[in-house]
Amino acid sequence: MVYSYSEKKRIRKDFGKRPQVLDIPYLLSIQLDSFKKFTDQDPTGERGLEAAFRSVFPIKSFSGNSELQYVSYKLGEPVFDVKECQIRGVTYSAPLRVKLRMVLYDREAAPGTVKDIKEQEVYMGDIPLMTENGTFVINGTERVIVSQLHRSPGVFFDHDRGKTHSSGKVLYNARIIPYRGSWLDFEFDPKDALFVRIDRRRKLAASIILRALDYSTQDILDLFFERVQYKIKKDSLVMALVADRLRGETASYDIKDAEGNIIVEKGRRITARHIRQLEKTNTTELEVPVEYISGKIAAQDYIDPDTGEVLVSANAEISLEDLAKLSMAGIKDIDTLYVNELDHGAYISDTLRIDSTTNRLEALVEIYRMMRPGEPPTKDAAEALFQNLFFSEERYDLSKVGRMKFNRRLGIDDDEGTGILTKEDIVAVMQKIIEIRNGNDEVDDIDHLGNRRIRSVGEMAENQFRVGLVRVERAVRERLSLGDLNELMPQDLINAKPISAAVKEFFGSSQLSQFMDQNNPLSEVTHKRRISALGPGGLTRERAGFEVRDVHPTHYGRLCPIETPEGPNIGLINSLASFARTNSYGFLETPYRKVVDGVITDQVDYLSAIEEGRYVIAQANIEVDADGRMVEEQIACRHKGESTFMRAADVQYMDVSPQQIISVAASLIPFLEHDDANRALMGANMQRQAVPTLRADKPLVGTGIERTLAVDSGVVVAAKRGGYVDYVDASRIVVKVNEDELTPGEAGIDIYNLTKYTRSNQNTCINQRPCCSVGEPVVRGDVLADGPSTDLGDLALGQNMRIAFMPWNGYNFEDSILISERVAQEDRFTTIHIQELSCIARDTKLGSEEITADIPNVGESALSKLDESGIVYIGAEVKGGDILVGKVTPKGETQLTPEEKLLRAIFGEKASDVKDSSLRVPNSVKGTIIDVQVFTRDGVEKDKRAVEIEEMHIAQAKKDLTEEFKILEEGVFGRARNLLIGAGFAEAELDALPRPQLLVQTIEDETKQTELEQLAEQHEELKADFDKKFEIKRRKITQGDDLAPGVLKIVKVYLAVKRTIQPGDKMAGRHGNKGVISKINPIEDMPYDENGNPVDIVLNPLGVPSRMNIGQVLEVHLGAAAKGIGDRITAMLEEQRELAELRGYIKKVYELGEDVQQQVDIDSFTDEEVLRLAKNLKGGIPTATPAFDGAKEKEIKDMLELAGLPTSGQLKLFDGRTGNEFERPVTVGYMYMLKLNHLVDDKMHARSTGSYSLVTQQPLGGKAQFGGQRFGEMEVWALEAYGAAYTLQEMLTVKSDDVNGRTQMYKNIVDGNHQMQPGMPESFNVLLKEIRSLGINIELDQE
C-alpha cells in the first residue's frame, strides 16, 4: 500500500486477514443524499420540491375561468453563513422563489381560449438548508432529522395468531396501506364471512364494497367461484366431471365409469389412484343420485321462460322441490358453485347472505352511513364520498413504492401503475385473502425489511411542504373565484405563511427533529445514521410488541443487531450497518460479492431484503485459495433467512466484509467477537457518551475504522486538494495547490479557517488544532487539523491507561474503579466544558430594564470584574455568585415612609425605584470568561462594550480578509514572476521592481502576454472581491439584531470550566465495562512492577467472568505489547542506536502476523521518515484488530515477545504500601478508558433554603429546582421501626411542610432558642380538601 507523507507520520499495524474489497461508504450520505434530492431540481418531477409543486398546481378556480400554473422554482442564497446563524440564534435557511403563471380564460369565446397571462416570481417562505455535515441550524442550535423506518405502502396479509376469538381460530386479514389516504382492511370473522373496514371504522360485509363498484350478485359469484354443471335427464342427474375436484372426498354414491364399472364404492375415500383410473377411461360425466344436488348453491338466477318468475335466485341453496320446478319449466342445465370445506370455502357466498344491500345505491348509502354517522345520505353525496376515498388522485396515493409492492404481492408483472386503486385491485386483494384462507398461500411477515422502508429527511420535508401547499391551495381557489382577476397578480393570491409554518413546525418540533448529540464525533455520526421506528406515522413505545423490537434475519448487513438503546426504546431505535444504503424505493440494501461456479469475483452488487431471499449467500470468512476459489466442499451459507450448509458450486454471493453486519459504533470495539452481545451493546452506547479530553490520545488497540470515522464526521479539517502547506497558525491553514489540480484562472490557494473554543450542544468544547507544519506536502483527503477527540486524524475518545486486574482493599468492589493520583496530575482525563449564560433586558410596564454597572446596594468588590457598561471582562476568573452582567429592573411605586420622603426631597428622585436583577454565576460553577456577545435591538443605542465588540469583530474580519487577499495576491504575483522569468527577464531585475509592477510588463510572446493580462485582470478581480466581501461583513456586523418582541438587549457570556477527574465520575472501557471512581490513590500506594512502574488503574477481576466480555482481557494483552514495543523504540532512540537497527525492528513489527493483508514497505521510507515514524511510535505502536477478523492469540503472544514481555501477559506486582509481593501474578496491560458525560459535578447537590411546591408546600425536587431529598414512605417506615418518634415528627412537620412551624423554627434558631413547636403539615390539609371533594365532610374539633 502507498502511504502519503502525512499518513507516514504514524501507521496503525493492521491484523486484518481479509482483503478490503469495498471501502466503507461516506457515513453521512443517507442524510446528504436525501436532502439533495429534496432541493435539487428534478426534471422528471418525481421527487423533491418539484414533485410537491406539480402535485398541487395548476390550481383551477371553481368556475374554471382562471387557473394558477407552476413554472419553476429557485432557492436563493442564505443571508448568514452557518457560524453566524449559530451566534445570532437564527435559522440557516434560503428563500424559496417560485415562478407562477396566472391564466385567465375568455368566458364568451370557445372553451380554452386564453384571455390573459400574467407571470411573476413569488416568495414562498424560507427552506432550512442542510450544513455540509448533515445537520440543520434551527434558531441557532444544531439539529438532526432522524430517518424513520415505517411500514411500506402496499398490501399486507396477516392473521391474528388465534388471539381474537376464544376458540383460538386463526382469522386472516388483508390491509391496503396507501402513502396517503384511507386504509382499506378486509377481515374474516369466526363464522368465515368476509368483512371490510375503511379507516378502521365499523365493519361492513365485504360484498358491499363490490356492489358499490357496480358488481351484481352474479358477477360477484363469477369472480370468486368455479362452477359445477348438472344436466337433468329423465330420472337422473348427470354431473360434468372434473376429476381433481373429487380427490380426498368420501363417495356418497357408487362412482362408475362410462361402461358402468364401479370404480369407487359408496362410503370409500377417493384417492389419487381412483382419479387416475377415471382419467384413463376418459370419463367426462358422472351419473349422480337426485338427492346429491340438494343443498348445493345456484350460480345464477333461473327464470321461468314462460312467466318470467325467478325460480331459483343466484346464491340460493337448491332443494329437491326447486329441482322439480326447474325440470317442469324445461330448464335442463343447472350450474352450482364449486365449494368444499377444505380448500374452496363458501366465504363470499356466506357474506352475500349477510349483506342486506341489493344494488349499487344501497351499498353506497351504507358506506356513507358508516363513514358519516348521523348525516342524511343523498345519492350525490354518497357517490362523491366513495369516489374520493380510493379513486381520487388528490385524496389517495399509493406512491411508486406502494404500487410496486402491491403488484408484486398480487403477482402482477408490471411494477408501474396508477397511484389510485382500481376495481380490479380491490377484487384481486379479496381473491388473494380467500386463497390464503383456503391454504394456498402464506401470510406476510411484517417485520421483514422488505415490508419496512426508510423515510429520510428529504422525503419528510417534502411531505410537510406539500401539507403547507395544500393549505395555500384552498385559499388561492377562493381568491381566484372572488377577486377581480384583472387587477390581481400571482403575488396577491399566495400567502407564504402556511407554507413556512408547516416547514418550521417540522424542523422545530417534530418528534424526529432532534437536538444533535454532540458529545464527540462518534455521537454526531451515529445520531445522523440512526433509524427510528417511532414518530408520526410510526409505532408508539407502548404499543410496540416483542416481535417488532427483535432482530430479524433480514437485518443482516442492513441494521446493526448490537447498537440500540437500553430501556423502553430497545429495538425501536436502530443504527444503520456500516455498508448499508437505501435504494430508490427507500428499502435498505447491502453489498455482496458475486460468486460464479465457486470462484469469487470482484463484482459487487447491492441487494435489498426481498432480492436477497432468492440467493445463496456465503459469509465473508470462508477459506479461499490464491485464485479466489472456495477451498471447502460444504460452505456455511444463508438462504431464505435460514443458515445452512451448501455445496461450493451452489453459492451465488458472498459478504463483502466481516464488519458488514454491525454499525460504526460497534465496529470501533476491538475483539468484539469475544464479547457477550449485551455488554457489546453497552460498549457501543457508552462510546457515544465519552467527553473529549484536553489532550486526545489515539487508542493503542483500535479496529482500523478510526480514521474513516474522524474524517467523515467533519470535525477534522481534511485537504480538499493536494499541494503543500504554505502557512499555519492556530486559527488558519493555507495550502498552495498543485498545478495539475488547479481550475484555469484561479489563484491556486486554499484557506482553511479553524474553529476555536466553541460550545457544543452538550456544553463540551469544540476546538481545532493544526497537525501539519509549513512546507509539508499534502494530498487530497489528508488531515490538516485535529478536532475534538481526534489525534493525528484518528478518532481518540479516551486515554490509554495502564491497568491491573486485582482487588485492592475493597475500593474496586462492585465495579468501582481505583485510580492513581498521577492520572489526575497529568490531566489525562481533564475536560473543558463551556457554558453559555445569557442576560436579557426587556421593556416592562414600569419602564425598561437597563444593563449597567450602577447597581443598588452592591459593594465595590462585587463589581470589580465588570467594565463601565456593566459587563464582565474576557479572561476574568469567576466563581459561584459573582455578577457577570449588571442589570436593574424598575420596581413598582411603594408607599413611602415620611423619612424616605424627606430623603427623596433632599437627594432627588431615582434613588430606590430599581431592583437588582443581575446575571450571576450559578452556585456550583467556577471558571474563566472566554467570550462575551452583545445583541442590541434595531433602533436602540449601543453601549460602549457593544461598540468595542463590534469594532473588534470588524478589525478581525478586515485582518482575516486582508491576509487572505495578501496570500491570494502573492499567488498571482508568484505566477506572474515565473511567467516573466520564462520569457527571459532577469530575476534580480524583477525582484527590484515593486510587486504590482510585475503585472504591467510587456512580453513579446503573444500567448504569454495574454496570460500576463489574465493575471492582471485576476488581480483587479481579487481587489474588487476583497472590497465587496469586506463591505458585506461590515454590514452584517454593524446591523441591528432581530430580537423577540419586548427585548431590548441580550448579553451572552461564555464560561469555560475545567473539570479534572474526581471520585464519583463515571468511567468505562469499550466492552461495556463501566464503573464509578471510588478513590484517587497516592502514586506511592499503587501496586508496582519489578521495574518500579506503578499502575494507573486497578480494576476488579470479578467484573469479567460473569459479564462474559473477554474482549477486554485480550485488549489489555495486546495493549501491553503495543506499549512495550513503543518503550523498546524509545530506548533505541535514547541510546542513539544505528538507524538500520531501528528500521529493522520497526519492519519486524509491521511484518508480524500470519497472512495479514497490510503491507508496509519500511525499506522504501527515507531515513527522515523512519525517524519521524519512530518518534510518533514512542508512546506505543497503534494496532488495528477489526471485528470478526482480528488478532489471533498466537499473534498477541508474538507481539508480547517482540516487546520483551512475558507471553502470559502477567507480571509480579508489589504492594505500594508495604513493598510486599502479591501472592500471585497479575494481568497488567493497557486498556483504552473513556470518561463519560455523567460527571459528579453535574449531579451532586445540596439544598439550603429554596422554593416550595404551591399546593403541598413541600420543598421541590431535583438539582435544577434547587430541591431537597424526598423523605418518602419507606424512609418513614424505617424511622417507625426504630421507634425514633421525635426525629419522625421533625421530618414530617418543620423539615417539610408545616409552614408556620418552619418560620417559627428559623426565628428560634436566630434567637439561639433551640426548641420546636410542630404544627399542622400542609399536606394534611390537602388530604382533607381531597376527601371533601369526594363529598365527605371531615372537620377537626379541638377538645
Curated annotation (Swiss-Prot):
Short name of any one Pfam family annotated for the protein: RNA_pol_Rpb2_1
InterPro entries, per database record: DNA-dir_RNA_pol_bsu_ext_1_sf (IPR042107), DNA-dir_RNA_pol_bsu_external_1 (IPR019462), DNA-dir_RNA_pol_su2 (IPR015712), DNA-dir_RNAP_su2_dom (IPR007120), DNA-dir_RNAP_su2_hyb_sf (IPR037033), RNA_pol_bsu_bac (IPR010243), RNA_pol_bsu_CS (IPR007121), RNA_pol_bsu_protrusion (IPR007644)
Keywords: DNA-directed RNA polymerase, Nucleotidyltransferase, Transcription, Transferase
Reaction(s) catalysed by this chain's protein: RNA(n) + a ribonucleoside 5'-triphosphate = RNA(n+1) + diphosphate
GO terms of molecular function: DNA binding; DNA-directed RNA polymerase activity; ribonucleoside binding
One CC-aspect GO term: DNA-directed RNA polymerase complex
Any GO BP annotation: DNA-templated transcription
EC number: 2.7.7.6
PROSITE patterns, per database record: RNA_POL_BETA (PS01166)
Gene3D superfamilies registered for this protein in UniProt: 2.40.50.100, 2.40.50.150, 3.90.1100.10, DNA-directed RNA polymerase, beta subunit, external 1 domain (2.30.150.10), DNA-directed RNA polymerase, subunit 2, domain 6 (2.40.270.10), RNA polymerase alpha subunit dimerisation domain (3.90.1800.10), RNA polymerase Rpb2, domain 2 (3.90.1110.10)
Biological role: DNA-dependent RNA polymerase catalyzes the transcription of DNA into RNA using the four ribonucleoside triphosphates as substrates.
NCBIfam families: PRK00405.1, rpoB
Family classification: Belongs to the RNA polymerase beta chain family.
Quaternary state and interactors: The RNAP catalytic core consists of 2 alpha, 1 beta, 1 beta' and 1 omega subunit. When a sigma factor is associated with the core the holoenzyme is formed, which can initiate transcription.
Annotated protein name in UniProt: DNA-directed RNA polymerase subunit beta
Organism this protein belongs to: Shewanella loihica (strain ATCC BAA-1088 / PV-4)
Classification of source organism: Bacteria, Pseudomonadati, Pseudomonadota, Gammaproteobacteria, Alteromonadales
